[in-house]
Amino acid sequence: MIKISPSILACDFARMGEEIAKVDKFSDYLHVDVMDGLFVPNISFGMPVIKSIRKTTDIFFDVHLMIERPERYIEEFAALGSDLITIHYESTENPAEVLKQIRALGKKAGISVKPGTDYSVLLPLLPLCDLVLVMTVEPGFGGQKFMHDMMPKVSALREDVKAGGYDI
């Protein structure tokens, strides 16, 4: 199943409301990259921005947390209207517990891996996931060149998801 989820990281920040309105009718999700400058070398949006844009649209919010120790903020991001919260495997000591925390709040849970991380670390987590994101760029900046050598990882993971009968 294909879902369209444009990233607001690519929008004109001075016209964020207008930019969101342009894609709202034609998109399934709105992808919101949250970066803390620690887990990745860039800073993007925080909770106040999500709170503000949530008031402008009822589109499904796909919030991608590229932050250290995301478990500290899951409740707040859920309360602000995130529908799906994706964490990075590498960002926390216990990704399974964070995924359970997200689901316990009634939200969909996603897991992501950086290009250098072996996808097999995700296999025990698949029963806890609604989405798996294999990064095909180094996280932290938009507009990077696609890493074609990540496609075998995507294909292998797809086969494992299918073989396990997971609805991801």
Give, region by region, the residue ranges found by the protein language model.
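Carboxylate-rich, divalent-cation-coordinating active-site regions
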Residues: V132
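A short, flexible beta-alpha/helix-coil linker loop
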Residues: D36-G37, V137-F141
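Predominantly soluble domains enriched in secretory-pathway, periplasmic, or organellar proteins
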Residues: L99-Q101, T117
